[in-house]
Amino acid sequence: MAKVIGIDLGTTNSCVAVMDGKDAKVIENAEGARTTPSMVAFSDDGERLVGQPAKRQAVTNPTNTLFAVKRLIGRRYEDPTVEKDKHLVPFTIVKGDNGDAWVEANGKGYSPAQISAMILQKMKETAESYLGEKVEKAVITVPAYFNDAQRQATKDAGRIAGLEVLRIINEPTAAALAYGLDKKEGKTIAVYDLGGGTFDISILEIGDGVFEVKSTNGDTFLGGEDFDMRLVEYLVGEFKRDNGIDLKNDKLALQRLKEAAEKAKIELSSSQQTEINLPFITADASGPKHLTLKLTRAKLESLVDDLVQRTIAPCKAALKDAGVTAAEIDEVVLVGGMSRMPKVQEVVKQLFGKEPHKGVNPDEVVALGAAIQAGVLQGDVKDVLLLDVTPLSLGIETLGGVFTRLIERNTTIPTKKSQTFSTAEDNQQAVTIRVSQGEREMAADNKLLGQFDLVGLPPSPRGMPQIEVTFDIDANGIVQVSAKDKGTGKEQQIRIQASGGLSDADIEKMVKDAEAHATEDKKRREAVEARNQAESLIHSSEKSLKDYGDKVSEADRTAISDAIAALKTASEASEPDADDIKAKTQTLMEVSMKLGQAIYEAQQAEGGAAGDASAESGDNVVDADYEEIKDDDRKKSA
């Protein structure tokens, strides 16, 4: 049987591994290295270079050497992160035909999936050279906070590279697999993964072959690239102060500075001081200029201290979501090249109150975990159960713009959840299902993943139709949503496509905004719930007044009409006040009591008590929002 390989497709470096008997083994590339730079370059004559050869010529060919492209994968061109990256990289980021962020080399545009595919091809060739056979299947890792668009784009990259991607697995989870495969006793561990482009923290319970993720969190704007750029900015500032020359717009100089910054950062993990020496960095009328500077570990730590501190909040959030304290964590596993930095290790020790575990290679452990998962799928690794989670809540927009969650964040996947909704208007023949992801109370504040229509509902009173909405998330974290009218059996479904995915900026913004706006969100939700209750009361009161108004006095009819009008005004305000709506709702209920009594007496007179009224079929169903979709609009959104 052909081998299934495990690939860690990293922002800065990539790594490939395979099961060799009962153990996972990292495969060395053609250059003899165990990791490969995630870089692709195009020479003037069109030659394509991948990995170390691309890195070697980056200084002389900065505009056509592409790196850290993983930051762009699955992102729209207008994404705030893309805007930030445009000013940090020497190559050009352009808008693709589909509106995604693409990169340009030698005047030709490439999608990030294409560039990633070139790196995956290098990994595939490395494995084929070692195994002596063709490789067609792989397990590929992604950051835990990657969204649907990014996961789908990663699968596309695998397909372009000639690989069938059997599974997309989260990087911290893969690391936990490699760490805990031979651990029999139960443990609660934290995987602290600070890599080249992203930061993830996952809390897991492991033991006797079971790996259960309890929670995950992260910061998708944080990684080694940010540390490098902080040092580059410092070097640019120092050089400008000493020489009066700004190197910001000199792409050749910036590429040299970036390489020097990365080298100095690595050296300072094992020494207290290093020297950055870049001769002929630029020139002016007086002649060539050289950059020579001594950099201490203390200075580097002061430059990047806020970046390191930014890892603390996600860690605390993950602990809270998992329902454990730092003291209850048995082991903290460090993953990612940046976790070698002494300052990072010091912060981790302070946060968790224990020395972090350094028994795994932070550059290789993720690929090893991917290989183990490949072995599980292939049947070579027995008695291993992996339970991962979805990082953000998923739900739909319901009446009043409320975000109704169907699947809460940190729910174990794969998972399937259904809930029954109904219509908001009489004789409503179509509903629009808007699928959103996030942590805010109002749908508009979360990210719209996609929408679709369920049409052909038979005319009936509001609240009567039973519409079952089902969310289905597979083991790759890819979402599918369906809606079915229980009465007619009509059904529609949507698979969230890459163009509708979330950006990293959106995900981080959702969680942080949710915390910052918790009070505001609560007030707005209360107002919407009060308005929904008010509209229901108005509807029933108007109907009762029309049918039985002649049973009460003119004064009572006027009082009820005035109370209905006042409640309508309060509930239709542009900034509805929950307390005002509740007060006017109470007033309407009180003035309607005589009408209710008259209705009861009329029914008694007609034939006695009707007995226990049958429960209204719309009870316990959440009202779904309604929007008429014209054919032209439907075509545009398709």
Swiss-Prot record:
Transmembrane segments: none annotated. PROSITE patterns: HSP70_1, HSP70_2, HSP70_3. Residues 605-619 have a biased composition (Low complexity). Keywords: ATP-binding, Chaperone, Nucleotide-binding, Phosphoprotein, Stress response. The modification Phosphothreonine is found at T198. GO terms for molecular function: ATP binding; ATP-dependent protein folding chaperone; unfolded protein binding. The keyword Nucleotide-binding applies. Residues 514-542, 605-638 are annotated as: Disordered. Residues 514-529 have a biased composition (Basic and acidic residues). Belongs to the heat shock protein 70 family. PANTHER family: HEAT SHOCK PROTEIN 70KDA (PTHR19375). Acts as a chaperone. This is Chaperone protein DnaK. It comes from Rhizobium johnstonii (strain DSM 114642 / LMG 32736 / 3841) (Rhizobium leguminosarum bv. viciae).
